[in-house]
Swiss-Prot record:
Gene: cls
Localization of this protein: Cell membrane
CDD domains: PLDc_CLS_1, PLDc_CLS_2
E.C. number(s) listed in UniProt: 2.7.8.-
Segments passing through the bilayer: 2-22, 31-51
Membrane topology of the entry: Multi-pass membrane protein
Protein name in the entry: Cardiolipin synthase
Residue span, PLD phosphodiesterase domain: 207-234, 389-416
Active site, per annotation: H212, K214, D219, H394, K396, D401
Reaction equations catalysed: 2 a 1,2-diacyl-sn-glycero-3-phospho-(1'-sn-glycerol) = a cardiolipin + glycerol
Length: 476
């Protein structure tokens, strides 16, 4: 036993040397790994093997990065592009950054609806699936074979039998679809793929990199993107969670092209195939007479561990820094890195009304403890923090100055910014932003406000626990 522990300790020393001198991570993450590998050697060893290897990360994504670049050039020939030099807008710098970081096209001929509950969203999804004539492309983190999951699978299977192209891509960890349901879909002519499959569901050396996207695209006429996964719990049927509060979008118009491009790249990678299909049918002609008459500026921005730039984080950062009057944020998990935390503090210190809403009852208790460790710094700067008490808050939204907002799959945490595959829509429109604000203030009615006075009264044990877990927060 002593020999085993000594071997683990020596291997951990090699890991630490690699982290410091080869991987050259940021100081926060480096210290977190040093602490856990030194003081919890066996646990640290296991966690590092599963979650920590940047060298393995580079190996995993080297082919994907090269393939995506090649395929992206091909996809661009089918997408609508605008000359950004001619755009004169309040947020031109953000638009330019998103374009340069993620090749994200700025489009205006869009119509966007917001959904704040799963009942209406799932009804709309099924209705649109039933109207499909050419193709249905679906990419989700969690997909369950429960009541609502089976309804959607039945709708997909029915369309596949009718000759509609059906492609369903799910994450290997989030997938809970029964094999018999998958077999029915395949027998009907549908196609099903798992993103980053492992030896078995929970033995996967790539477990750290999750496809957290929630995308549905139908005939390039309509698309859905947001925070809802597929399962009964999102309808509030899980008694342990209760009401599920989330935000999702329904998109019509040219913004769908970038979302379709994102799906095709992910599908191609999971399928280990080239884009050797007729792509014209997947993209909207920018000169089509069927485009929405509304003018709603939008960009689809995606990020993941296969990129050196943290695109969605950078977009959030620009929105925070641009805010002049108010900034309203909803996120289920709050683990900002130091630059993001400082940006929020500086916004509050500058007189911006910064309101951050988090779950009062986190689904993972330790994530609540980590979030708590950032409260004092924000409260001292003048930011306001609210805990949502009516069930579970899962929305991932940010709104600034009633003029710009972002909705999608990315939480405001280090994992979403650097380790998960995420997609958000950035919306440059006052009407949509005000609708988001209205919902934020509705949610405030069922929130408890965290005050500095009440927060300082927490127990010594809570303070010690928060301080300890804060040390490893960069790994969460």
């Amino acid at each position: 036993m002593h020999l085993f522990i000594n071997m683990i300790f020596l291997i951990n020393i090699v890991f630490i040397i690699s982290i410091i001198f080869i991987e050259r991570r940021n100081p926060q993450t480096t210290w977190a790994w040093i602490l856990i590998l030194t003081f919890l050697p066996i646990l640290g060893f296991i966690i590092y093997i599963l979650f920590g290897q940047n060298i393995t990360r580079e190996k995993n994504f080297k082919r994907k990065i090269l393939d995506d670049k090649t395929k992206q050039k091909y996809l661009n020939s089918f997408k609508s592009h605008y000359k950004l030099d001619n755009i004169s807008l309040k947020y031109k710098d953000l638009i330019m950054m998103n374009f340069n970081n993620d090749n994200s096209t700025y489009t205006q001929r869009n119509d966007i609806d917001l959904y704040f509950d799963a009942n209406s969203l799932f009804e709309e999804m099924i209705d649109e699936i039933n109207k499909a004539e050419k193709f249905i492309h679906m990419e989700f983190y969690i997909f369950k074979s429960d009541e609502i999951g089976k309804k959607i699978l039945q709708a997909l299977t029915k369309k596949a039998k009718e000759g509609v192209e059906v492609k369903l891509l799910v994450d290997s960890i989030g997938n809970s679809i029964h094999k018999k349901d998958i077999d029915k879909l395949k027998a009907a002519g549908g196609d099903f793929k798992i993103f980053f499959p492992g030896f078995c569901k929970y033995i996967n050396l790539r477990i750290n990199y999750r496809n957290h996207r929630k995308i549905l695209i139908i005939d390039s006429k309509v698309a859905f993107l947001g925070g809802f996964n597929i399962g009964d719990e999102y309808l509030g049927k899980d008694k342990n969670i209760g009401h599920w509060r989330d935000t999702h979008t329904k998109i019509k118009g040219l913004a769908i092209n970038d979302l379709e491009g994102r799906f095709l790249l992910d599908w191609s990678y999971a399928n280990e195939s080239d884009l050797d299909i007729d792509l014209k049918k997947y993209f909207i002609n920018p000169h089509s007479t069927d485009l929405p008459k509304k003018i709603i500026g939008a960009q689809i921005v995606s990020s993941g561990p296969d990129h050196t730039e943290q695109q969605i984080k950078n977009g959030y950062f620009k929105i925070i820094n641009s805010a002049k009057k108010n900034l309203f944020i909803q996120t289920p998990y709050f683990v900002p890195d130091e630059p993001m935390l400082e940006a929020l503090r500086l916004a509050a210190l500058s007189g911006v009304d910064v309101k951050i809403m988090l779950p009062g009852n986190p689904d993972h208790k330790f994530m609540g403890w980590i979030a708590n460790s950032y409260f004092e710094s924000l409260l001292n700067a003048g930011a306001k923090i609210y805990l949502y008490e009516k069930g579970f808050l899962h929305a991932k939204t940010i709104v600034a100055d009633s003029s710009i907002c972002s909705v999608g799959t990315a939480n405001m945490d280090i994992r979403s910014f650097s380790l998960n595959f995420e997609s958000n829509i950035f919306i440059y429109n006052e009407a949509i932003s005000k609708s988001m604000e209205e919902q934020f203030f509705k949610d405030l009615k069922v929130c408890t406000k965290v005050t500095l006075e009440s927060f300082e009264k927490r127990s010594i044990i809570s303070r010690i626990g928060e301080s300890i877990i804060r040390l490893v927060s960069p790994l969460m």
